[in-house]
């Protein structure tokens, strides 16, 4: 249901960029990115620190950057792991989604393993089992100069994967259930169905309509997509199976 796939993320190291305005202008003709947000990130960061331009760029965008790397100094691509919801919106309310950790959460938990910009479970099982799914970050001990520039690496510690979560959900039952709901429930209506083993309480399938695609959250949801979800009168983010209130 959920896996990790490589995402191609586009970065900028300002001090290596040469004519930064020219490079970003050329880049913006082929790749859409938030230039104002990038400028704010650059203002907060030192010029030798890389700054994310855009996450999870397409293969076509990767090809453009690679083909023009000589005229885009300081701009480079890194392959990094990204959460992948294999069946898109299937069981989305049960699985939940990821989102960037808020400043409030950072201040409240004071967990040194988190920093601003990290993605954490925001809802569903992603949120409930965040502590066991997140694993441990890799890090390295380095020698730096007075400005904080890295001179050499002293020791490296590889990252540790999080635990796997085994569910009682039956994918085939879940697929048939959601297919049946979409075939019988009007697009402008809502509803939910839960299939359980009475003897054990195991949840075999849990569907809520309308649903959403958690992949849109994995690398940071756009303001347009977020507004479309929260402004929808049928509240697709609500799990009606467990959060709805209904008359007897």
Feature annotation, model-predicted:
Residues 6-8, 13-17, 56-58, 70, ...:
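Solvent-exposed coil/turn segments that connect beta secondary-structure elements
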Residues 25-29, 43-162:
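Small/polar-residue-rich segments within soluble enzyme cores
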């Amino acid at each position: 249901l959920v896996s990790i796939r490589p995402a191609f993320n586009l970065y900028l190291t300002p001090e290596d960029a040469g004519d930064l305005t020219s490079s970003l202008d050329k880049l913006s003709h082929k790749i859409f990115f938030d230039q104002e947000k990038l400028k704010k990130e650059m203002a907060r960061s030192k010029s030798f620190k890389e700054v994310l331009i855009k996450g999870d760029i397409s293969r076509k965008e990767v090809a453009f950057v690679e083909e023009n790397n000589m005229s885009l100094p300081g701009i480079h691509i890194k392959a990094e792991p990204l959460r992948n919801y294999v069946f898109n919106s299937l069981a989305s309310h049960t699985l939940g989604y990821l989102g960037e950790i808020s400043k409030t959460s950072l201040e409240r938990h004071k967990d040194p393993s988190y920093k601003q910009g990290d993605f954490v479970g925001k809802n569903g099982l992603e949120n409930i089992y965040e502590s066991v799914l997140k694993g441990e970050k890799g890090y390295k001990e380095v020698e730096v100069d007075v400005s904080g520039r890295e001179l050499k690496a002293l020791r490296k510690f590889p990252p540790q994967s999080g635990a796997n979560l085994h569910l009682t959900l039956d994918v085939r039952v879940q697929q048939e259930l959601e297919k049946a709901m979409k075939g019988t429930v009007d697009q402008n209506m809502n509803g939910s169905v839960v299939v359980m083993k009475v003897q054990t309480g195991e949840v075999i399938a849990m569907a809520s309509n309308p649903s959403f695609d958690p992949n849109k959250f994995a690398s940071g949801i756009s303001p347009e997509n977020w507004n479309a979800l929260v402004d929808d009168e049928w509240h697709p983010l609500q799990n009606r199976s467990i959060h709805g209130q209904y008359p007897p």
